[in-house]
C-alpha cells in the first residue's frame, strides 16, 4: 500500500528471529539473543556461569547494520526508479557480529585464552586487565614485576606452554596483584610497555583525561 503511494520508499523491518521460520513468531529483545546465539556461554566468569552483559550489544549492533543497509539503499536509489524493503533480525546481526568466534567455536570447541597471562585480576583496591601475548612481552612483564626467575622457567618459555600452565600462572599473578593498589600496577606496567588498563566505570571513563 505504501509502495503505491511512493514507489521509491525504503522500508526497514527489524524483528527478533526473522520474518520467516519456526521462531519468527517469537518476540525477542537483546538479553534473549545473548542467550540464544551462544554469547552468554562464551562470557563465563571464573564461576563457570554464563553471564549476560548489561550493555544492549545486539540491539546496538542491529541498529548499526540497519543504518548501513539504509545508506546503501539510498545510494542505490539515485540510479533506480524504485525503493526496497529491508529485513534484518537481531539474530542475524548477533551472528554476524560474532562470526569469527562463532566459526572457530563450532570447529574448535569452547574458548580458551589465546595468551597467558591474560585476564582481569583483583588488586588491593579494584581490578586491572592485562594481556601478554608474545614472548618478549612476557619478559617485559616479568622484569616489571620482579619475576626474573620465571623468564627461563620451562613451563613459561612459550605462549603455548604458558597456556598449558595457565591456571598456575594466573594464580601467581592474582596473588601478586592483590598486594598493591591498581594505580601502582598500572604505572609499573605502563613503564615497561605491558598492555594493561584499570577496570573503570562509566563515570571514570567520561572523566578520564
Residue spans of the language-model regions?
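Active-site-adjacent "lid/gating" segments in soluble enzymes
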Residues: 3-128
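General beta-strand structural signal in soluble alpha/beta enzymes
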Residues: 13, 198-199
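Short, well-ordered beta-to-alpha junction loops that form the rim of enzyme active sites
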Residues: 91-93, 133, 199
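Aromatic-enriched alpha-helical interface/lid elements that frame and gate functional surfaces
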Residues: 117-196, 203
